[in-house]
Amino acid sequence: MRFLLSSALIFLISLNSFSQAWVDCGLKGGYGVTNLINTNVWNEPKIEPLISTGYAYGGKLGLNFNINYQITLDFIAKSSNQRYLFEPTQTIDKWEKNVNYTSFDIPLLFRHNSDNGSFLEIGPQVSFLTGATETTGSNSIDRKDYFETTNLGAVFGFGSFIFGGDNAYLVFGLRLHYGFQDLLSNAGGKNSNKYFPINNGEMDVYESGFEFNSYQTTNPISGLVYLEFNYDLAYLVRSSCKRTVLRFF
């Protein structure tokens, strides 16, 4: 909530501070790699975290101070996955488990647009968990309670203008995201030595009562390629009463 209020305040102050600025809007969609990083899981030889994929789509509002500098506020629906391969034993074959977790992401980004059409963007992101499902074989179980409802992270991206006209254009880019906060909740085994993805005894077939030696945080990470369609919406101009107003193209 504080992040949203701060974002709105920054946007409103900016609107009243730059009389030659303009506002654009856009639609975007992306696809790429999504993973959950946990050092204990990644170092356990009987569990192989597989490279997993996800997708995202949504919209953006951008405040352009000039042709080079911009602040953007995105509203993104995202579906992420993490697949785990459990190694076989003498009595069981190898088997796979997948967790799909969906979120509503709001990144507030500073973007620098270069004169050659490329751009860089960086800033914080708050994510709101909207669902989580664990699938083993043909069985799917709701695991939303295993994960925290919010997560604060950071975004870094870059890309380039592809084609377009004066007010509408298409860009292509890569966006990297890392969540700073632990994604697991108490129900998922937070602060214990037996936590997701082995909190339901998945490792007992290898060693009865298996636990990790310590607790390590689980952090989301992703790298998605995006296509983004932008449209220049309106200029900010000073009215006769000294107020900043929008004048649409």
PLM regions: where:
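Outer-membrane beta-barrel translocator domains and adjoining extracellular loop/strand segments
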Residues: 37-44, 83-90, 132-140, 183-191, ...
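Predominantly the C-terminal beta-signal and adjacent terminal strand-loop region
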Residues: 146-151, 156, 162-249
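Structural signature of outer-membrane beta-barrel domains
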Residues: 32-36, 78-82, 127-131, 177-183, ...
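Glycine- and aromatic-enriched membrane insertion/assembly motifs of diderm outer-membrane
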Residues: 46-91, 102-103, 117
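Extracellular loop and loop/strand-boundary signature of outer-membrane beta-barrel proteins
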Residues: 42-48, 91-97, 139-146, 212-215
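Outer-envelope beta-barrel architecture signal
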Residues: 21-25, 67-73, 116-120, 152, ...
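Short glycine/proline- and aromatic-enriched beta-strand/turn motifs that initiate or cap beta-hairpins
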Residues: 19-62, 219, 226, 230-249
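Residues on the lipid-exposed face of transmembrane beta-strands in outer-membrane beta-barrel proteins
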Residues: 27-31, 55-65, 77, 104-112, ...
